[in-house]
């Protein structure tokens, strides 16, 4: 596996890569990331993964400085997974002018759901992904459904800007007890880790209610919020939305997604379940 640190080297490598799949990450890799790599390997001749902890998508009081940097372990995992190249730019390499005057501004959905609690987050995501796409120039890129709102923003950006890159959604990787795999799971204490699957159980409860024909989304959402709060969670949101647009869902709609974000101790967990009736 080649390790590429500059934009010039990445562009030179890309010229001889053939059909190229790309997996952008912030490092601290786990089995969920490797699931994205496996999906990429199935679809292209070469796979490049990037590791870049993007300051622009962290808000005030968030964990940019504390975010785990595990470069050596990440390299070993990627090499074992058959990745052809790792793009590992410095902050100065990716943001050469230091200040970033031009940004990619997502639509109104960036201010809802996670965006309501993390102002500017999706602007930072859309901007860095655009920069990485321009540098790597992949044929396709794999994104996990666990970050459902992020996936929607990237898909909308690609469609609206007429980008030729194919976006491949990959199902959420889960632990045996249902907890969605996430780098932030490492922040959980042993007691919190035992409690964490409650989030997925509540999403599953809402899914079961929807599949049974319930149209009272508000009641299902409130029951989940109440259960989480009673167990000591701080709930940001639990919402049923349209799966394809993330707009507010109305009674009778067939393609839904249930999304939630809540804090367990100091750790913010997100998850979702698609419901196609």
Swiss-Prot record:
Active site positions: 33 (proton donor)
Record flagged with keyword Iron-sulfur: no
Localization: Cytoplasm
Coiled coil ranges: none
GO-annotated molecular function: ATP binding; pantoate-beta-alanine ligase activity
Gene Ontology process terms (BP): pantothenate biosynthetic process
Catalyzed reactions: (R)-pantoate + beta-alanine + ATP = (R)-pantothenate + AMP + diphosphate + H(+)
Binding residues annotated for ATP, in chain numbering: 26-33, 144-147, 173, 181-184
Binding site for (R)-pantoate: 57, 150
Any Pfam family the entry gives: Pantoate_ligase
UniProt xrefs under Gene3D superfamilies: HUPs, Pantoate-beta-alanine ligase, C-terminal domain
Pathway: Cofactor biosynthesis; (R)-pantothenate biosynthesis; (R)-pantothenate from (R)-pantoate and beta-alanine: step 1/1
Annotated Gene Ontology cellular component terms: cytosol
Enzyme Commission number(s): 6.3.2.1
UniProtKB keywords: ATP-binding, Cytoplasm, Ligase, Nucleotide-binding, Pantothenate biosynthesis
InterPro entries (UniProt xref): Cyt_trans-like, Pantoate_ligase, Pantoate_ligase_C, Rossmann-like_a/b/a_fold
Ligand binding (beta-alanine): 57
Subunit composition and interactions: Homodimer.
Stated family: Belongs to the pantothenate synthetase family.
Miscellaneous note of the record: The reaction proceeds by a bi uni uni bi ping pong mechanism.
UniProt function note: Catalyzes the condensation of pantoate with beta-alanine in an ATP-dependent reaction via a pantoyl-adenylate intermediate.
NCBIfam families with a match to the protein in the record: cyt_tran_rel, panC
Name under which the protein is recorded: Pantothenate synthetase
Species of the source: Chromobacterium violaceum (strain ATCC 12472 / DSM 30191 / JCM 1249 / CCUG 213 / NBRC 12614 / NCIMB 9131 / NCTC 9757 / MK)
Source taxonomy: Bacteria, Pseudomonadati, Pseudomonadota, Betaproteobacteria, Neisseriales
């Amino acid at each position: 596996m080649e390790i590429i640190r500059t934009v010039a080297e990445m562009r030179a490598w890309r010229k001889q890569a053939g059909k190229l799949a790309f997996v952008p990450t912030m490092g601290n890799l786990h089995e969920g990331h490797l699931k994205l790599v496996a999906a990429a390997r199935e679809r292209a001749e070469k796979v490049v993964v990037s590791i870049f902890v993007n300051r622009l998508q962290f808000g005030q009081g968030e964990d940019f400085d504390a975010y785990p940097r595990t470069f050596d372990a990440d390299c070993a995992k990627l090499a074992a997974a058959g990745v052809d190249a790792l793009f590992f730019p410095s902050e100065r390499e990716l943001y050469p002018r230091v200040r970033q005057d031009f940004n990619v501004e997502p639509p109104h959905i960036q201010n809802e759901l996670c965006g309501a609690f993390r102002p500017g987050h999706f602007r930072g995501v859309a901007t860095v992904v655009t920069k990485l796409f321009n540098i790597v120039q992949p044929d396709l890129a794999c994104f996990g459904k666990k970050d459902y709102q992020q996936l929607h923003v990237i898909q909308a950006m690609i469609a609206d800007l007429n980008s030729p890159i194919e976006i491949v959604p990959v199902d959420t990787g889960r632990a045996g007890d249902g907890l969605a795999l996430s780098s932030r799971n490492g922040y959980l204490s042993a007691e919190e880790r035992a409690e964490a699957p409650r989030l997925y159980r509540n999403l599953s409860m809402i899914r079961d209610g929807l599949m049974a024909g319930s149209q009272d989304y508000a009641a299902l959402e409130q029951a989940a919020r109440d259960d989480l709060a009673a167990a000591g969670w701080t709930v940001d949101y639990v919402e049923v939305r349209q799966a394809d647009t993330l707009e507010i869902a109305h009674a009778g709609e067939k393609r839904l997604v249930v999304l939630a974000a809540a804090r367990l101790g100091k750790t913010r967990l997100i998850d979702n379940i698609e419901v196609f009736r």
